[in-house]
């Protein structure tokens, strides 16, 4: 079977700690977005959905307790199982891949692949604790690069910074591969 995306939805991009989304819990936010998603495909009902795959980079605090399943329940999809996938910044991309694989394997026909992250709500609990001291030099290198006082970013043989923010990674790759914003 072929896997296809039939509809998409997303929230506006918020401003961490001060934007219009800062007071919305991640489970409530994901339920709002999925309500919008389902309105775009009225022929699809919760009875058609084989699974809700929810990507979440910080599945703790308000995003904990299997936010995939919690979102399904908030939507009234009590018969729909849910799973939380953690692959940090690419968690929601992983859910799309998982849904496509499940369809191709014949495990189901209809999956909701989603993702949620509410940085403003991290004060209510998060999973990341202290960083491993082994990466201190790499983190310092990233911080120095972020100041803009260093040469252009390029791959190197040093230990990579496993804690680098996705936005900084995107900037580095765009610079290295000469990808414009146009």
For the regions a protein language model found, what residue spans apply to each?
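Short polar catalytic/cofactor-binding loops
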Residues: 8-13
């Amino acid at each position: 079977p072929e896997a296809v995306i039939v509809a998409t939805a997303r929230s506006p991009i918020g401003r961490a700690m001060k934007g219009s989304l800062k007071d919305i819990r991640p489970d409530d936010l994901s339920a709002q977005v999925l309500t919008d998603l389902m309105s775009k495909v009225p022929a699809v009902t919760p009875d058609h959905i084989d699974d809700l795959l929810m990507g979440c980079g910080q599945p703790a605090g308000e995003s904990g307790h299997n936010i995939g399943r919690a979102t399904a329940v908030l939507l009234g999809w009590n018969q729909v199982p849910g799973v939380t996938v953690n692959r940090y910044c690419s968690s929601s991309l992983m859910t799309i891949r998982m849904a496509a694989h499940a369809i191709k394997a014949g495990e189901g026909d209809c999956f909701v692949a989603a993702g949620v992250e509410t940085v403003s709500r991290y004060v209510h609990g998060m999973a990341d604790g202290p960083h491993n001291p082994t990466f201190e030099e790499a983190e310092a290198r990233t911080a120095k690069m972020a100041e803009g006082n260093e040469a252009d970013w390029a791959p190197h043989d040093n230990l990579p910074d496993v804690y680098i923010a996705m936005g900084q990674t995107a900037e580095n790759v765009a610079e290295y591969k000469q990808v414009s914003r146009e």
